[in-house]
Amino acid sequence: GVQTCALPIFFALTLLALIVKGPKFKGKLKYRWNIPLVLAGFVLFAGVTQLALEKRVLSNYFGNIAFAYEDYGYPYCLGVTIFDTGISCPRDYSEKEIKRIEKTEENLPETREGEYPNIIFLQLESFFDPELVNYLEISEDPIPNFRKLMKEYTSGYYKVPSVGAGTANTEFESITGMSLRYFGPGEYPYKSILKETTCESAPYVLGELGYSSHAIHNNEANFYGRRSIFPNLGFDTFTSAEYMPEEDDKNPLGWTRDRVLTDEILKCLDSTEDQPDYVYTISVQGHGAYPEEPELEEHEITVTGSPTASKNNQWEYYVNQIHEMDNFVKELTDRLEDYPEDVVLVMYGDHLPTMGLTVEDVDNKYLFQTQYVIWDNMGLE
């Protein structure tokens, strides 16, 4: 895209300006030695970088670009984000080749006609089971409702592309089914290609089956550019915090509480008659950065076991926020249980919280996953 091309062009123009306008060496250049040394330097750098990638000392996939710059340094990260722009266009990519592929799919069974259920996706900000953190002592289960649903309905671990940040990338993968590994390191499709074009997505596919598609987010519409991105993803409507009557229901960090989403989801379901709805909901209450100082209000749930007092304060704040989010999950499922139409509700966390967790800190030994549960009011088995 334009943004991707601009970086190498800017880099090249800056280098050219330095060559033309920069100070000149007055001595005699020893080209016989200097040129081979420069070439050898490039070859050595490329070889060492490739070896480091093979040995997993370096990575060309950044789950959190800020952490990547801390781990691998500025020169490597800058270089890899400039020159690695993701998967290349296949050599045989053409209209003729696509038509040939389409012909091979002609014998697939057709989608059965009938009544389809409403589909709700609920992406919960930084939501996961803190009891998986092996050094924490928590006074009571912070997510009893979500845990009960995981036992009673289809559930498991949900692989996500980021850690501690990158909500929009989990969102992108969930809406499109495309992996971020096809993009450049640290790239946000919301900030690059989707600003210019559309792509295949759940709203477009479900639209062919008669679905109306809605996006809901209890944060401002311009966050991650969603206001302009969601139309390109095929959503018919987008309701952001600015249009919610209870927008002022804030947590101590100023994020709108997730309980305001229940009525907004039901409004979307009620907005269409004789038509199923796809409602993609993004929560925000669990967002950081979490306070290192203790809060004035006494928390319902206490947390101990963190290596420092400041980290313990962060965990206690976080645990009590996801406890409120868990109460919201119960309120939502209770309301949907009595809804007169069929509903399938998919709930999952977008990524782990920004707590500096390592694989040794969590019982499941993997940082790129949260939990999911698929609930319904239809008695599915």
Language-model features and meaning:
Residues 1-2, 6-117, 138-157, 192-196, ...:
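N-terminal secretory/membrane-targeting segments
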